[in-house]
Amino acid sequence: MVLNTKIVLACVVFTLCMACQNTTKLPDPLQAGWQNQAVCEVVENNPKIRVLKCTFPPGVGHDKHYHASHFGYTIQGSTFKITDTTGTRVVEVPTGTEFYNDGIDWHQVQNVGDSTAIFLIVEPK
């Protein structure tokens, strides 16, 4: 009886642990796209870095995705609606803006401006 109780308890703990895990794997920025259309392309991929060029015409965005650690540079800016763990906000992203991030759990963006935005994203490996 003690053995059966231990097995049942172990099964319950295992089930609870599995239920607490995030079962939804989000795409990275290259995989994400917008409404099943690619918005990023690989411009360099080597053993040390991956560089993406992401282009967002007005009205186009980036479906919910995550980012690993990365550096970004804004080749051409615009205005974006950004939704993430802190809520939704509208942000002006000027041309020439650079940024670094240790990683983003998830976000979704949409170009709500009137000009096409272009970013370079550099991801160390």
Q: What is each stretch, according to the model?
A:
Residues 59-62, 98-110:
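Histidine-centered metal-chelating micro-motifs
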Residues 1-9:
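Bacterial N-terminal signal peptides that target proteins for export
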Residues 33-61, 68, 72, 122:
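A short glycine-rich, His/Asp/Glu-containing loop-to-beta-strand
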Residues 16-19:
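C-terminal motif of bacterial Sec signal peptides marking the signal peptidase cleavage site
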Residues 21-23:
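Bacterial signal peptide processing site
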Residues 77, 104-125:
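Ligand-binding loop in jelly-roll beta-barrel domains
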Residues 67-86:
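Glycine- and acidic-residue-biased ligand/ion/polar-headgroup-sensing regions
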Residues 86-104:
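Short acidic-glycine-tyrosine-enriched beta hairpin
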